[in-house]
Amino acid sequence: MLNADLKQQLKQLLELMEGNVEFVASLGSDDKSKELKDLLTEITDMSPRLSLSEKSLKRTPSFSVNRPGEETGVTFAGIPLGHEFNSLVLAILQVSGRAPKEKQSIIDQIKKLEGSFHFETFISLTCQKCPDVVQALNLMSVINPNITHSMIDGAVFREESENIMAVPAVFLNGEEFGNGRMTIQDILSKLGSTADASEFENKEPYDVLIVGGGPASGSAAIYTARKGLRTGIVADRIGGQVNDTAGIENFITVKETTGSEFSSNLAAHIDQYDIDAMTGIRATDIEKTDEAIKVTLENGAVLESKTVIIATGAGWRKLNIPGEEQLINKGVAFCPHCDGPLFENKDVAVIGGGNSGVEAAIDLAGIVNHVTLFEFASELKADNVLQDRLRSLSNVDIKTNAKTTEVVGEDHVTGIRYEDMNTGEEHLLNLDGIFVQIGLLPNTSWLNDAVELNERGEIVIDRNNNTNVPGIFAAGDVTDQKNKQIIISMGAGANAALNAFDYIIRN
């Protein structure tokens, strides 16, 4: 089931195992069980430290990743290929005794959790957000015997996942716990465990502190570190919104990559320099005093720096119409690559006629029964090559001059109301899902009017990435820079870094 290149890479990784690992599989006579057995047999044959046995588990097909004679609580229900193959490899290594690449403070938090925690995560193999959650919960299960975790492929266990319309969907002890991407710190925070503020309070002041973890942040950090400046990053996750991007084909010199690969490479590049990357934590306030610029974190810690570069990026913009908020993750979605497979053979709408909206409609057309694309303007704004491809699809309708007015449904989406701007008539379209692709909303709510914002909530900057507050710079999608592209954000981050360096020299 694995190609030659992947088998070679896996064989090398399995050499890092520090102890024996046993796959305990629950198999039936169905095709998926046969596929799973073939996969596990193929992997087991690659290392003498691996073995395979069979036992009836809660779900079939499924398997646990155990130490001989010891259950770890790590279970995969389905066949973990696609984006989840890395989750399987990491589970094997960690169960074998390989030390995780996680801060000791996080490991200590996991060990201190008391009680019984049985997590179940519903995923799709095309979901780029899902592996982060699966890997975090698997690691927690390996570290703390009070925790167990099962990854469940919704495409295999359709009856269980019938009412799940967004992934990853996490359940704890049978109750809904959370949806969407979550870091291990997010999960711990939801469980009531937070990082000790003293870990941050004892840090020396920085020359440059960068808030945010996306392309602009990474570029800025590398440039300031190369200048010999003491550099820190405060971010929820390295890569930012790019983590949720499927294909990237316009990053010059790289013909094609994915958001997760890009983010992984960015993190590796940052690690090559003396950069204090503090991830899994968010800033909640910023203030300039006579002594320094102070950034307050969500745990109450305060960091000080000579300069700050704000690169907090942007998140999905919502429609802000009745019914939308209460039906998010119940048919209203923002990531077609993650949630598209959950709407197989169903009718969906895509809202937005720009590149993102048209690309989403094209991708979904290959999965769902029918796509209706809504655009408020009189014509689509996407590139012509994308429009041509969209119009060639037989199961896509395009509605321009269409104003969406209400998402219809009780416990899940059943339709959408829209107004024909030409006639003023209102229509109801019955459907199962709505993918919102109307642009991004800058992450500036935490700034509390510390710097000047425009009417769209973006940070106002000049050509040198200065804000209206000396020493505070901004770069990337969080700013009023017109074009929002990865490559432009990276250039902006470098520009902000060089001007921060110049500011420090002159002050």
Curated annotation (Swiss-Prot):
Pfam families attached to this UniProt entry: Pyr_redox_2, Thioredoxin_3
Cofactors demanded by this protein: FAD
Highest taxon listed in the record's lineage: Bacteria
InterPro entries documented for this protein: AhpF_NTD_C (IPR044141), AhpF_NTD_N (IPR044142), Alkyl_hydroperoxide_Rdtase_suF (IPR012081), FAD/NAD-bd_sf (IPR036188), FAD/NAD-binding_dom (IPR023753), Ferredoxin-NADP_redctase_2 (IPR050097), Pyr_nucl-diS_OxRdtase_2_AS (IPR008255), Thioredoxin-like_fold (IPR012336)
Signal peptide boundaries: none
Ligand binding (NAD(+)): 347-361
GO biological-process terms attached to the record: cell redox homeostasis; response to reactive oxygen species
Disulfide bonds: 335-338
Record SUPFAM superfamilies: FAD/NAD(P)-binding domain, Thioredoxin-like
UniProt KW keywords: Disulfide bond, FAD, Flavoprotein, NAD, NADP, Oxidoreductase, Redox-active center
Gene Ontology terms: cellular component: cytosol
Gene3D superfamilies cross-referenced by the UniProt entry: 3.40.30.80, FAD/NAD(P)-binding domain
Entry binding sites for FAD: 207-222, 467-477
EC number(s) given by UniProt: 1.8.1.-
Cofactor annotation remark: Binds 1 FAD per subunit.
MF annotations from Gene Ontology: flavin adenine dinucleotide binding; NAD binding; NADH-dependent peroxiredoxin activity; thioredoxin-disulfide reductase (NADPH) activity
Keyword flag Heme: no
Top enzyme category: oxidoreductase
Family under the similarity heading: Belongs to the class-II pyridine nucleotide-disulfide oxidoreductase family.
PANTHER family according to UniProt: THIOREDOXIN REDUCTASE 1-RELATED-RELATED
Protein function: Serves to protect the cell against DNA damage by alkyl hydroperoxides. It can use either NADH or NADPH as electron donor for direct reduction of redox dyes or of alkyl hydroperoxides when combined with the AhpC protein.
More details: The active site is a redox-active disulfide bond.
Subunit structure: Homodimer.
NCBIfam families: AhpF
Name assigned to this protein: Alkyl hydroperoxide reductase subunit F
Species lineage: Bacteria, Bacillati, Bacillota, Bacilli, Bacillales
